């Protein structure tokens, strides 16, 4: 493995900040970019306040995210909601970018058809987005076969009519900060279930779904992987592990599995929980797994609980980066000098969205707050697909 000191010597002489519009940073209503960091320090949603931030590590940002606040159906008279989506791409940005553009629209469509929000609406929206992306893969297969190996972990939260819907496919995570009045503390409560082969429960699920495949999960270099290839068991995309038609040339050999399969190896169906929001529920921390590699649930909740709301998502990311630097026995100031691509040796792309819950607003079906639509990453995220 290349040492931290060696990488610093490689990049220090030629390092420069990625170009951004304006001088040191850019600011507008949709957030601000400062080098590899994007942030929207504060804003209002229909049920309270929020803070968002993204740090890029990959050469192309693979994390995409969205916060929508307003009608959650195709009609302005429909229920008001706050929608949060965190999409952690792997193999490239295409799947995460696609989901960021289309999943919320599919949720609005099915909410309208259903005349309301439900777990079934969310599942339908995930599966419709999956089918749309697989259709895109099919169209581009001959000219861009690599797109069959691209996928995205998808975490969604919807606050609507006093309920919180959490849907997850992959290993991003949402943690609730809940006030324990008797002990005068704010306790971390994980609301999402994760789909990573490192978890025994996930390995057992895979074995039960594929009883005739002894290689469905393989321990490779001390890491459990599905078919020895990928750690997550659910995603949108990853067509090469969903449809046998993509498990062949011209896809690179490292992505092909030797056995013929007749049903999807990975799944796109999200695990969904519905939580009634109580006055003790203070805030939610949505984040891609890059944050949770460096901070525990309770550490993240303690930071949000004890620090000012303004810029709190950015503070969580900076705290995680300090931990990443410490693990590599280097200074945080030196880590900040490392450019994208090389930066991936030290940490992943990280997305954090902190959503504060105002108990006076949560249960309302209407709100006078302005409509809001913001995508995380700004100029870092590149063009939409």
Curated annotation (Swiss-Prot):
Quaternary assembly: Interacts with BIK1.
Biological process GO terms, please?
negative regulation of defense response to bacterium
This protein is called what? Probable protein phosphatase 2C 38
| Residue numbers binding Mn(2+) 1 | 88-89
Q: How is the cofactor bound?
A: Binds 2 magnesium or manganese ions per subunit.
Q: Which domain of life is it from?
A: Eukaryota
**So which cofactors does this thing need?**
Mg(2+); Mn(2+)
Known InterPro entries for this protein? PP2C, PP2C_BS, PPM-type-like_dom_sf, PPM-type_phosphatase-like_dom
Q: Modified after translation how?
A: Phosphorylation at Ser-77 induces dissociation of PP2C38 from BIK1.
- What's the family? Belongs to the PP2C family.
One example of the protein's molecular function in GO is: protein serine/threonine phosphatase activity
